[in-house]
């Protein structure tokens, strides 16, 4: 049996401000730092250890990973950074307040943009200063690989090649993985692992900073999954994610 640990980054400054973040590179709040440390403490208390860590190229995920590994005394672990683990790109919504956007367009439309499988938000213009196409961290990518907007379907299509080419082979060789990523890149992985339908994925919310453990068989099919720590607290935190965007 293999174990895979997925952690959504701790609270970011734009989580706190209830803003659409996407690929915007915002930092953790003090609460987010504590959530990341608590994730490490939970993992340490349960006896978890790792051989390699994976994260995105966005600082809220990389800092979450660092604080988690620091609590585990594993800051020396090899870390694989990939843009494919970035948060879903929210297009022209990036930087906007979720509640104000809901008041303008309606709760239903914002829910579709936030949680539906195949409907992306309005795209950024290519020359919009919020676009990441001139960001040095994406310099080796083609312009088409740096999105101007994404739906979850697009995020799945971006994440799965990385799972198939890097993460899954590492697990099959017996390496123990911890992944610090984002709500939607984790939703993409969970959708694939659990075979969740396009319709059902709308209701899945990933809480900040709580380790999600997958136990996998030799074919990397899930045997079970669970959050570490207080299950009721994890459920409450997921519900809080679901309520974002409401006035």
Swiss-Prot record:
Name a GO molecular-function annotation: phosphoglycerate mutase activity
Q: Where is the active site?
A: 9, 87
EC class of the enzyme, as a word: isomerase
Q: Name one GO biological process term.
A: glycolytic process
Q: What SMART domains does the annotation carry?
A: PGAM
Among Gene3D superfamilies, the record links this protein to: Phosphoglycerate mutase-like
Matches recorded under Pfam families: His_Phos_1 (PF00300)
Give the function comment from the record.
Catalyzes the interconversion of 2-phosphoglycerate and 3-phosphoglycerate.
Query: Record's NCBIfam families?
Result: pgm_1, PRK14115.1
Name of the protein in its database record: 2,3-bisphosphoglycerate-dependent phosphoglycerate mutase
Q: Which gene encodes it?
A: gpmA
């Amino acid at each position: 049996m293999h174990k895979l640990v997925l952690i959504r980054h701790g609270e970011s400054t734009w989580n706190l401000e209830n803003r659409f973040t996407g690929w915007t590179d915002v930092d953790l709040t003090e609460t987010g730092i504590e959530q990341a440390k608590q994730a490490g403490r939970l993992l340490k208390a349960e006896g978890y250890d790792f051989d390699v860590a994976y994260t995105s190229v966005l600082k809220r995920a990389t800092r979450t990973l660092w604080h988690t590994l620091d609590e585990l005394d594993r800051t020396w672990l090899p870390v694989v950074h990939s843009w494919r683990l970035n948060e879903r790109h929210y297009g022209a919504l990036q930087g906007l307040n979720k509640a104000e956007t809901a008041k303008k367009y309606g709760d239903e439309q914002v829910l579709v943009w936030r949680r539906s499988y195949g409907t992306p938000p309005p795209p950024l213009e290519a020359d919009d200063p919020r676009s990441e196409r001139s960001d040095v961290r994406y310099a080796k990518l083609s312009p088409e690989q740096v999105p101007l907007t994404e739906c979850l379907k697009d995020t799945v299509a971006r994440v799965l090649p990385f799972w198939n080419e890097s993460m899954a082979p590492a697990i099959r060789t017996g390496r123990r993985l911890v992944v610090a990523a984002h709500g939607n890149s984790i939703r993409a992985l969970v959708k694939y692992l659990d075979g969740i339908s396009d319709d059902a994925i709308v209701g899945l919310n990933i809480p900040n900073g709580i380790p999600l453990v997958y136990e996998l068989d030799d074919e990397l099919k899930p045997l079970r999954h669970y959050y570490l720590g207080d299950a009721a607290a994890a459920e409450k935190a997921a519900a809080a994610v679901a309520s974002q965007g409401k006035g």
